[in-house]
Amino acid sequence: AHGGVYAHPGVPIGSHPPGHGMATSPAVSQAMDGASLSLDASAKSSENSDRGLLAMSLGNGSADNIEGGADHGNSQSGDTEDSTDGSDTNGAGVSERSKKRSRETTPDNSGDSKSHLRRCQPTGEINDDSEKAIVAVRPGKVGEKVMGTVLSPSMTTTLEMRNPASTHLKASPTNVSQLSPALPNEAWLQNERELKREKRKQSNRESARRSRLRKQAEAEELAIRVQSLTAENMTLKSEINKLMENSEKLKLENAALMERLKMNS
């Protein structure tokens, strides 16, 4: 009879004998080596049996022995190598019960464990001498090593290595403003020239208007002065005429007085 072995939670373990149609990657083989070292320690701990993952069930043991190993966790790893007897039906029942137990213990990662079990199991019929391994793999542990590396935002891709200048130009928004500063400057200078020209024209118009108003005011003042001077001239002429009349009268009086003097002498 063979007992079930429970690994520490989060440690994917598995063991596939070579030559039975299974191809193992280096990452999976490293996980298997680490699992074989931790079998003895995990079998002795009864507390980890309830919270651990069912990772491997070896041999063709009965279902009763597997349940006893799950409840008590005291089965030794040496029991897995004692006997290779059994039948295909017992092996199928053990594998189905172990699959069900693995699905019950890990409900979140059921899809990933099923896909990994399908990849790990051979396509042909299971022989009596072959050992069956059911590996429950958590996503992010062995899958990352098998599938490849995950690109992070800080990693430099091949396109960035080939064209570093273009990527820097695209990444930095300040370069966009530095590429075309000429056109806005020229337009700004032309607009400034137009503004200066308009200001100059406006100042010329203002100065011409001020000079015109000043000349108009001076002309009005001169017209007023001319009118006043003409009025004074008319008054002077009238006074001159009066004086001439007075002088004529005085001349007549003088002539009359001279005749009287001649007559009296």
Curated annotation (Swiss-Prot):
Q: Where is the composition biased (Basic and acidic residues)?
A: 103-115, 191-209
User: Per its UniProt record, what CDD domains does this chain match?
Assistant: bZIP_plant_GBF1
Q: What ranges does the record list as Low complexity composition bias? A: 35-46
Quote the protein name from its UniProt record: Transcriptional activator TAF-1
Q: Which organism is it from?
A: Nicotiana tabacum (Common tobacco)
Tissue expression per record = Present mainly in roots. Barely detectable in stems and leaves.
**Keywords on record:** Activator, DNA-binding, Nucleus, Transcription, Transcription regulation
Instruction: Using the UniProt annotation, give all residue ranges assigned to the region (Basic motif).
Output: 196-215
Query: What Gene3D superfamilies does the annotation carry?
Result: 1.20.5.170
- Function, in words: Trans-activator of a beta-glucuronidase (GUS) reporter gene. Binds to a G-box-related element, (5'-GCAACGTGGC-3'). Also binds to the HEX-motif of wheat histone H3 promoter.
Hey, which family's this protein in?
Belongs to the bZIP family.
Q: Where in the cell is it found?
A: Nucleus
Looking at the record's lineage, which domain of life comes first?
Answer: Eukaryota
Q: Which terms does the UniProt entry file under GO BP?
A: regulation of DNA-templated transcription
Q: Which SMART domains match?
A: BRLZ (SM00338)
What would be one Pfam family of this protein?
A: bZIP_1
Question: InterPro entries from the entry?
Answer: bZIP, bZIP_plant_GBF1, bZIP_sf, GBF-like
Q: What are the GO cellular component annotations?
A: nucleus
For this protein, what is any one GO molecular function term? sequence-specific DNA binding
